Amino acid sequence: MAGFFDSLKIGFGGASRILNSSFVFSTKTILLLKDLALGDDTLPIRLREAFEELGATYIKLGQLIASAPSLFPDEFVSEMQKCLDQVRPIPYSTIKTIVEKELGGKLSDHFLSVEPIPIASASIAQVHSAVTKNGLDVVIKVQRPDIESTLSADLNLIYFVSVLFEKFAPGLSKSGIADMVEQFQISILEEIDFYKEANNIEEFEKELLSMGETRARVPKVYRELSTKKILTLERFYGAPITDENSIRRYSSDPQKTLTDALEIWFSTLSRSGFFHADVHAGNLMILRDGTVGFIDFGIVGRISPRVWEGLMIFLEGLSLNRTEKIAKGLIQMDSTAKGVDEKKFSKDLETVFSKMTEMVLKVQMGDLESLDDKKLNAILFEFREISIQNGLKVPKEFGLLIKQILYFDRYVKTMAPDIDLIRDRDKFLI
């Protein structure tokens, strides 16, 4: 209950933010009621619009929903995938003031130049290209002013509401909503501590070094030019790994480069349970020297050996068309599972398993459009619902990992059609 009472501790700024949030949600509720009167259920749309309007925490919450199809209904997951984390840029004069305050002295004491126009502007931070006093090309990630107090007010309100839902909404007392919000709170507060992101980058780099891996790199962290609120990193030049035409400028064998990237990602996951949890076309590059570049480590994941073992059993069942293996894998992932009827669970999974098998087979036959977000989200949500009905609690990392693997499979079918990522998964473990 400590978190409940902590959620009531807000200052004037927090109260103002909560009033603003209440106004936005009230406005969207009125629009929703009008829609319902006309026979249209637009709750996911109105919620997404409210999240985008409020920015910061709510956009991150939308992204959490979008990335966790095993936890949320399909219509919300699909709508939140449209949640745009693009906001009006902070004026350069404000960026300059923040950097000078964080590093001390004048901007020119630390950088030869900083590009006034940002590379990217999101709800939590803004990114500018720059050149260090030593002539090195870097990017500077700068937190938006007052973001920490905004997040605190938002998170307190969200947690307070989640506790009320669990206490008074029928059927939600055992849903674990408040626990999930509490984990979200921990995660997002870590994301605004750029020391944590710097640590994540260097941890991934240590994994690469421990494997003797020279095919991949992460950007160098310039600790002397970084604080909790600004992060200065080596600037990478190259092409997104999914842009086959562009990467041919840097790699004579794009197929091998892609399989190298997959091998590295799988191997760091299997060796230590640590993985980059947001690998997409924008965060995975082929650099000018032909190596693979992993960027943006604001979101990482960690899984236990038990979850990894369960995931491998699950994928084996998927590749062999055996629901009993899939059931065994899901049971293995839940350390609290006791007395689960494996045969009944396997039988219950048959329908949803056939849907996933059909999707995977279509992708393997070259029908890349079959890997549709809406269908995949619905399938993963069904897995979760059936698991809950059978007394299982599927870890949140499961949906994230399965979705990542299936999207990797889509990239593979574009550039390396002879490879079956699910069937050949062991080949990517070094």
Predicted region positions:
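N-terminal accessory/targeting segments that precede structured cores
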Residues: 1-126, 149-177, 412, 419-420, ...
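Helix-rich C-lobe and terminal helical cap/extension of kinase-like folds
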Residues: 12-15, 39-41, 236-257, 287-430
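Short hinge/gating elements
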Residues: 39-47, 68, 79-86, 141-147, ...
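Core structural elements
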Residues: 57, 121-124, 224-232, 376-380, ...
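ATP-dependent phospho-/nucleotidyl transfer catalytic cores
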Residues: 74, 81-88, 100, 152-153, ...
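Glycine-rich ATP phosphate-binding loop
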Residues: 129, 136-144
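Conserved beta3 strand of the Hanks-type protein kinase catalytic N-lobe
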Residues: 130-131, 279
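Hydrophobic residue at the +6 position relative to the catalytic HRD Asp in the kinase catalytic loop
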Residues: 282-286
